[in-house]
Amino acid sequence: MSERLNNGQMLPRLQLPAIGGGELHLPDALTGKYGVVLIYRGHWCPFCNEQIAAFVEAFPTLSEKGIMVAAFSTDREEVTREFVEKHRIPFPVGHSADVDEVVQSIGAYEMTFPTRGRFLESTGFVLAPDGTVINAVYSSRAIGRLVPSDVIRLVAFMEGLKAQATANAEP
């Protein structure tokens, strides 16, 4: 098992095929704004469907507050495309993630089910505009994951700290 990421560490670079063509480069795709990276178990997971649906619903508010979102899983391109269409996902979604690469680079939990094969457990990161981790949520099973309202509140809190530090630094 590799080590999990701590607050303040840079999210390691990941490159995944993206729905719609091209590649999803993380954290680069989110650099310059606060970012959310959602690793979901798969299109078949009801908890993942709920989480993604919540981020889709909150996407206008997240965008207004300068928060970008990206998601990925080990699902094949075809089922990921159907998943994106089903939820009308407006943010970048990667597919066909390599379990070993993701486990080694960011420390996500993995699981193998006879009916589902090998996949990544739900993992979420809130990133600062420079790509460093502000918050990491590692789940070892289906529950325990980022929710949009917490992300919005955390970013507001971080912005408040930054404003306070700036005010205290002024002569």
Predicted ranges, named:
Residues 1-171:
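Chalcogenol-based redox active-site neighborhoods
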